[in-house]
Amino acid sequence: MTVKTKPVKKADLRILQSLEKKVLWLSMWMVHNANHLRQSVDGLKVGGHQASSASITTIMTALYFNVLKVQDRVAVKPHASPVFHAIQYMLGRQTEDKLKAFRSLGGTQSYPSRTKDTDGVDFSTGSVGLGVAMTLFASMVQDYTRLNEAVNKPLAKVNKPGRMIAVMGDAELDEGNIYEAMLEGWKYDVRNLWWIIDYNRQSLDGVVSDGLFRKIQDFFANVGWNVVPLKYGKKLEKVFALQGGDTLRQWIDDCPNDLYSALTFKGQSGEKDAWRSPLKKDLRGVHGIKSILEDHDDNMLHALMTNLAGHDMEAVLEAFHSVADDRPQCFIAYTIKGHGTPLAGHRDNHAGLMNLEQMDVFRSKMQIPEGSEWSAYDNLLIEPETAKKFCLQAPFNKRPPQENEPPKITIPDNLPLNFRSSTSTQASFGNILHELSRGNTDLASRIVTTSPDVTVSTNLGPWVNQRGVFSLDVRNDVFRDEKVASAQKWLRHGTGQHFELGIAENNLFIMLAALGLSGPLFGTRLLPIGTLYDPFIARGLDSLNYACYQDARFMLVATPAGITLAPEGGAHQSISSPLIGIGQPGLSSYEPAYADELAVIMRWAFESMQAENGGSIYLRLSTRAIDQPSREMKPELENQLIKGAYWHIPPTDGARIAIVYSGAVVPEVIEAYEQLKEEIPELGIMAITSYDRLYHDWQRSQVENIEAVSYTHLTLPTRSLV
């Protein structure tokens, strides 16, 4: 589809081109200052990816100073962090001191961070590929918050949907999680999603394979995306229209990526006839080529041959403003790594830094006098006041600097729980959600569940039967319509409260991240619950860490876990997952043994997921049915089991030994106690509900040099029974 758009105003284009140069300068200087000028206390290289930043300055300038609206959200590729912070500085949303402290304590972060940066990062990025997928799932969550009537009741107005935008490096397409996410997006008919590929054709160790763009086009087209190649800038397009221009275009099209990069480096280094020699050799006798070459000296020819669309402000703006619908868009923007700097095109430029001599050359080229390095608006081709006014009035800059805190969700004093005298924690989990699903509470309306194709086997089935599966299209349950008996009745509609995912754990955790940030992103607080088999946490561990790193709030229910997985065989055992629960920041892990413990922990979890200093929760549950205690859950007991442990059977005075357990092994523990109590009458049983909380409380006490909170009321000797 061809869409006609109004041309960019010449005055605005001139301003944006000037701002682009300032963004390039500030981002390069930020890295230079951190590595060569700032005092180093340890002599370690700081780094900062100057070349990766230089390739994206045109696109980022176009986005933040012209294209983005308040409701749009952006994931900036990790290695473009200096560009992002330079732009926020020019928008008045970042301080000079933080730029000077880039990659040091209290300064701007190496990679954009929601939790550590202070200038409005929408999505943390890094590891590579995760932020890209995050925009896709955020788009799905945006649709959910807009379509779910129960969620939208508190909202006075449903605003126009924003575009979820990922500015990504081409090497990120090597990450498999991107393709897993794309497939899930296709299933859900994802919309309002832009992925802008910085196609500089260079990665950490060299140059990418020729023809990669064709594969990219095929991948995206196959799942319903509109693919927009941005290859040639306006200068080249004008020359292509001349006699011999078609042949010149074909020469560039056929030029291997590594040769093009090498010629780019030679050209920017000022080598005589860097481009002219191969063009004269390869295009000898082609009518019109001689005239084109004669009309350009070496500098002009270098500027022409590197006039790729990703560095042409007019071409970039035309492409972005040509989007006429909410279909997902993939922009393949041809760029040059290190563009406009002495590093341009060199195969080793990924981790390369301009040395002092190169920076002097670059400073002279950018016309930045000494003492003006950190100026946001001076030394441009436009007046400083004009530049400042344009920046401060950018559409994106109308976004409030601080995200609004959505109202908290009311949690009842007790969660509904009806259980048999013998039951498992997994069954109790399903029972609690089923009871909630039958009510009309604020809590029930804000719970959203998701699972990677293990919904039924993790006991979410009754919840889904009551609440439905989220879908942009209404789809009936065919088995039910055909009167085929089934325990499941899955209706799909826009108010469903379950996202059914394929078997891809990365998708689960990034989906939970997007749902868990729905409050700050879209103004609607949700309480997401994700389920999976406990061993497969390891399949998506980097994505889990990514979700926790940006302080997304969710409940992760891993079930079955522990010994109840024995029939699954050796590859399905959850051996190391307790260590994941202990080691993962932002995630509190629990392993209750009884149904009443689970109800208390889940209620606390829903509160913690909303607390300023709270976090996410990881529950390891079991399918092993055990006899339930007949007891009153008093506040003191609730407090102890939330803190991590309580006395299941208190020891008597003089006790020097105790049996300590966690989870569904309690029948064996009680049996052992019965066998030992005659010989050791003072013996007690300690129930650990959270080895995570217990350990971190002890660790904190060591750091703070204070007495640990006592759960045992006795000193355990070196000889103990566990």
Where are these regions (language model features)?
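Long, well-ordered, tryptophan-enriched scaffold segments
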Residues: 199-417
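Cofactor-binding active-site loop characterized by glycine-rich and histidine/acidic residues
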Residues: 11, 15-23, 27, 31-39, ...
